[in-house]
């Protein structure tokens, strides 16, 4: 437990260099754990970002910065404050608790009822958030696309890019991806979202067919450059397989075919998020070569 006196206040100009140094150290440490991450940052660019970001707080003790906290946005739809992986640092869980306590009233005033933080998936870090009441809900895994896919596909397997005319098929496939026991989205919201994805020229809505029957899907979108991440990169989402075909290799064939398509298009890294509620999902993505790099922790704000 941190025993030195700690004072938390809004981040000011004299804190910027110290916060930048902490962010750079965290990014370098994360890259040392995963070759799919980049360990160096553009210092001037980082300094400009830290100088301008708001709301942000620092924890200081005996003249030095011992922690910081940044909120990148308030999601008014889900009413959550979002914290990126390099948006928090702390020398001790008690420092993190002090930062979160200071931020809570500002988040409430902005309309948030809770927070969600993407943190580096390192046990001591995840445990520190847990001591502050946050719950691990998802992981983000990364896989390098250095080599061609080494798995074959079943006879009659075909992967194609869907379009607006595939809306009803895509809606059926998308429902198969709903987490078991979870609350499914409103059907009109689902229809609007799937239709938007099918119409977006920058997004690949891919449907896998076996013998001419649509049995699986994946949505692939290019990722904008992010601090600490390799580029060009793609994000996989909405991966779904016909429940009657699960466990027969169709999901593996889908993912490997999608990744090979991305590799041939020039992408060097793929990432995917998965919920931790189902250990089978975790095993599947780890088995496909995705290494967890970040964890999503969430908590409602105390009343």
Q: What are these language model-derived features?
A:
Residues 1-4, 87-155, 294-302:
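Acyl-donor-binding surface of acyltransferase catalytic domains
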Residues 7-21, 30-33, 158-172:
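A short beta-loop-alpha structural element at the N-terminal edge
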Residues 27-47, 178-194:
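Conserved GNAT-fold acetyl-CoA-binding loop/helix
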Residues 35, 39-98, 210, 218-239:
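Conserved donor-binding loop and adjoining core beta-sheet/short helix segment
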Residues 92-106, 238-241, 247-260, 264, ...:
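Conserved acetyl-CoA-binding loop-helix of GNAT-fold acetyltransferases
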Residues 115-119, 236, 270-274:
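Conserved hydrophobic beta-strand within the GNAT/NAT acetyltransferase core sheet
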Residues 127-129, 285, 290:
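Conserved active-site tyrosine of GNAT-family acetyltransferases
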Residues 155-234:
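Flexible, substrate/cofactor-facing loop regions flanked by secondary structure
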């Amino acid at each position: 437990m941190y025993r030195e006196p700690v004072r938390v206040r809004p981040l000011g100009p004299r804190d910027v260099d110290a916060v930048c140094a902490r962010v750079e150290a965290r990014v370098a440490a994360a890259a040392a754990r995963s070759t799919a991450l980049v360990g160096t940052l553009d210092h001037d660019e980082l300094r400009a970002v830290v100088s301008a970001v708001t709301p942000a707080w620092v924890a200081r003790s005996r003249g030095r910065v011992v922690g910081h906290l940044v909120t990148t946005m308030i999601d008014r739809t889900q009413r959550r404050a979002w914290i990126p992986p390099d948006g928090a640092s702390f020398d001790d869980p008690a420092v993190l608790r002090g930062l979160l306590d200071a931020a809570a009233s500002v988040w409430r005033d902005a309309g948030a009822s809770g927070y969600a933080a993407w943190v580096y998936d390192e046990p001591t870090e995840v445990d520190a958030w847990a001591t502050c009441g946050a719950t691990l809900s998802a992981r983000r895994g990364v896989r390098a696309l250095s080599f061609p896919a080494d798995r074959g596909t079943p006879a009659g397997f075909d992967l194609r890019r869907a379009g607006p005319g595939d809306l009803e098929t895509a809606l059926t496939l998308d429902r198969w991806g709903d987490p078991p026991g979870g609350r499914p989205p409103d059907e009109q919201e689902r229809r609007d979202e799937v239709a938007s994805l099918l119409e977006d020229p920058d997004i690949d809505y891919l449907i896998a067919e076996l013998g001419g029957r649509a049995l699986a899907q994946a949505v692939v979108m290019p990722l904008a450059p992010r601090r600490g991440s390799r580029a060009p990169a793609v994000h996989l989402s909405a991966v779904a397989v016909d429940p009657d075909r699960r466990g027969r290799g169709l999901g593996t064939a889908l993912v490997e075919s999608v990744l090979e398509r991305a590799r041939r298009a020039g992408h060097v890294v793929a990432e995917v998020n998965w919920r931790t509620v189902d250990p089978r999902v975790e095993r599947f993505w780890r088995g496909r070569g995705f290494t967890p790099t970040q964890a999503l922790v969430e908590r409602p704000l105390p009343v």
